[in-house]
C-alpha cells in the first residue's frame, strides 16, 4: 500500500520519470568489523548508491580545519573510496563532518567567530578538491545541546550561508561540477525547535537528510521497549510519515527532503521476560550495549529460528529472544519506506549504513536491504542499465588503449609486440561481445520481473526465507 503524506494524487503521477537520490553512509569503522562482516571499499557495489557519504571527519581543536586524516589512518581510506568512481564515474563522494561523538566542541569552536567561519569555508573547498570529494555533509549533533551555547543556533545558519555562497561562486576551469552541500538533521520536535533554524538552513543546502531512526532507545525515560523507526503510528508523532510531514510544513521543500532508513536494530533488556509487547518496561540496552545491531547479524538470528513478529500499525518488525527485545527494519519495511519516498516525489533516501547490510550474502542474496530500497524506488532498471553502460565503457576504453599501443608497435616495426597486441584486442572484443550478450539477457530478465510486478512479501513470511 502506498502511503501519501499530503494526499495530492497528481503529485504521485509525476514520479515515474523522476530519479531518486540514494545517499549511502559508509563508516570508517566498517574496516574494523570481524572478517565475516567487515566491508572494505573494494567490495562495495558502486551502482547501489548515487551518493556515498564517508563518515566521519572531525573538526580539530582550533576550529579552523579538519583533523589530519592520518590521525585516523583515513588518508588511504579516502583514496580507496574515491577509486570506486573508476567503475561508476557518476558516483558522488560526500564527506560528512561531525556525527554523534565528534560534533559539539569542534563545531562550537568553528562558529565562535566570523573569522573562523570565513577561514574554514575557504579551507574546506581546497580540502574537498584535494581529496576528490564532490561535496560536504554537515552533521552537527546538535547546536545548543551538550554544552553548546544558545547562540550556536544562529551561528550554524551563518556557517551554512557562507559555505553555500562559496560553493556557488567557486570557479575552476577543469572542474565540471559544483560542490554539493547537504545537512543531516534529527527530525524530532524536541531537537528541531531548539537546535535548528530550519528555513534558514534548508534554503541554502542542496538536500536535507532526516535521520528517521533512533526515535526510541535505552536513553528513554521512562525506559520502555519501542521500535526506533516506525513508518506510521496511531498513538505517537514519532514516526517517519508524520515527521516527514512536519518538516515540509516547517519549510523544507519536498524536492530537497531525504528520508533516512536504518540498516540496524535497537535492543532492550526486558524487565520481565514474559512482558514483551511494545511499551513493556525495560532495564537497559540489550546485547548490543546501545551500539545498534547490524542487519548482517540480525538475519542470522532470524534464520536460526527466532520468530519474527510484526507491528501492523507501525509497519515494522521486531523479535524477542529470552529477555532481549529488538526492533529493526527488514527488506519488507525498507521497501515500504522507499515507496513512501517514491509516492510523494521526495528527493530520495539516506541509508545508515551500507556496511550494516548483508553485503556478503551470508543469509541469502547479497545486499538484501539495499536491493529492497531500490525496488521500492522503482529504480531497479536504472541500476541494471548503469552497470551495463559502465561495463561497456570500460571494455571500449581498454580496446582503445590497446589499439593506440598497436599503432605504436607497428610504427616501430616491433612485430612480436604487434602480434601480442592484435591477440589482446581480439580477446577484448570477444569479451565485450560476450558481456553484451549477458547484459542483454540480464536486462530481459529484469524487465520480465518488473512486468510481473515486485510486490511486498506477505507479513507472515519470515525475512531471509524469501
Swiss-Prot record:
GO terms for molecular function: chitin binding; endochitinase activity. It is found in: Secreted. Residues 1-17 form the signal peptide. One of its GO terms (cellular component) is extracellular region. It catalyses: Random endo-hydrolysis of N-acetyl-beta-D-glucosaminide (1->4)-beta-linkages in chitin and chitodextrins. It is an enzyme of class 3 (hydrolase). The active site is at residue 141. Residues 20-380 form the GH18 domain. Keywords: Coiled coil, Disulfide bond, Glycosidase, Hydrolase, Secreted, Signal. Prismatic layer of shell (at protein level). Expressed primarily in the mantle with highest level in the mantle edge and lower level in the mantle pallium. Pfam families: Glyco_hydro_18 (PF00704). Residues 408-442 form a coiled coil. Its EC number is 3.2.1.14. Disulfide bonds join 24-49. Its main location: secreted. PANTHER family: CHITINASE, CHITINASE 11. Belongs to the glycosyl hydrolase 18 family. This is Putative chitinase. It comes from Pinctada maxima (Silver-lipped pearl oyster).
Amino acid at each position: 500500500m502506498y502511503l501519501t503524506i499530503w494526499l495530492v494524487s497528481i503529485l504521485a503521477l509525476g514520479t515515474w520519470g523522476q530519479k531518486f537520490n540514494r545517499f549511502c553512509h559508509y563508516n570508517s569503522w566498517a574496516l574494523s568489523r570481524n572478517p565475516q562482516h567487515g566491508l572494505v571499499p573494494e567490495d562495495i557495489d558502486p551502482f547501489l548508491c548515487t551518493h556515498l557519504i564517508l563518515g566521519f571527519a572531525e573538526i580539530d581543536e582550533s576550529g579552523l580545519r579538519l583533523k589530519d586524516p592520518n590521525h585516523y589512518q583515513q588518508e588511504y581510506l579516502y583514496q580507496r573510496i574515491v577509486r570506486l568512481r573508476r567503475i561508476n564515474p557518476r558516483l558522488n563522494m560526500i564527506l560528512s563532518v561531525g556525527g554523534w561523538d565528534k560534533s559539539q566542541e569542534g563545531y562550537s569552536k568553528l562558529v565562535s567567530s566570523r573569522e573562523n567561519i570565513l577561514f574554514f569555508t575557504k579551507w574546506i573547498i581546497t580540502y574537498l578538491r584535494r581529496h576528490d570529494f564532490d561535496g560536504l555533509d554537515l552533521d552537527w549533533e546538535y547546536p545548543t545541546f551538550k554544552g553548546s551555547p544558545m547562540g550556536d543556533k544562529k551561528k550554524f545558519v551563518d556557517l551554512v550561508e557562507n559555505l553555500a555562497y562559496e560553493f556557488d561562486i567557486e570557479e575552476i576551469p577543469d572542474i565540471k561540477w559544483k560542490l554539493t552541500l547537504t545537512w543531516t538533521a534529527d527530525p524530532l520536535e524536541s531537537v528541531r525547535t531548539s537546535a535548528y533554524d530550519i528555513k534558514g538552513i534548508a534554503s541554502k543546502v542542496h538536500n536535507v537528510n532526516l535521520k528517521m531512526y533512533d526515535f526510541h532507545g535505552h536513553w528513554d525515560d521512562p525506559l520502555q521497549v519501542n521500535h526506533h523507526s516506525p513508518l506510521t503510528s496511531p498513538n505517537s508523532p514519532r514516526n517517519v510519515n508524520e515527521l516527514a510531514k512536519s518538516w515540509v510544513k516547517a519549510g523544507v521543500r519536498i524536492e530537497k527532503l531525504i528520508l533516512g532508513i536504518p540498516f540496524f536494530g535497537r535492543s532492550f533488556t526486558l524487565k520481565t521476560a514474559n512482558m514483551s509487547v511494545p511499551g513493556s518496561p525495560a532495564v537497559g540496552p540489550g546485547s548490543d550495549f546501545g551500539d545498534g545491531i547490524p542487519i548482517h547479524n540480525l538475519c542470522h538470528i532470524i534464520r536460526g529460528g527466532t520468530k519474527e513478529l510484526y507491528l501492523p500499525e507501525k509497519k515494522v518488525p521486531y523479535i524477542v529472544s529470552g529477555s532481549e527485545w529488538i526492533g529493526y527494519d527488514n527488506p519488507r519495511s525498507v521497501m515500504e519506506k522507499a515507496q513512501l519516498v517514491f509516492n510523494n516525489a521526495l528527493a530520495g533516501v539516506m541509508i545508515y549504513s551500507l556496511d550494516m547490510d548483508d553485503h556478503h550474502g551470508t543469509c541469502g542474496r547479497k545486499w538484501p536491504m539495499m536491493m529492497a530500497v531500490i525496488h521500492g524506488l522503482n529504480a531497479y532498471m536504472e541500476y541494471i542499465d548503469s552497470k551495463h553502460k559502465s561495463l561497456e565503457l570500460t571494455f571500449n576504453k581498454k580496446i582503445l588503449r590497446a589499439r593506440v599501443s598497436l599503432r605504436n608497435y607497428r610504427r616501430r616495426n616491433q612485430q612480436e609486440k604487434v602480434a601480442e597486441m592484435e591477440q589482446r584486442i581480439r580477446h577484448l572484443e570477444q569479451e565485450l561481445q560476450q558481456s553484451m550478450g549477458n547484459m542483454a539477457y540480464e536486462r530481459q530478465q529484469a524487465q520480465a520481473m518488473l512486468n510481473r510486478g515486485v510486490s511486498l512479501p506477505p507479513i507472515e513470511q519470515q525475512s531471509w526465507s524469501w
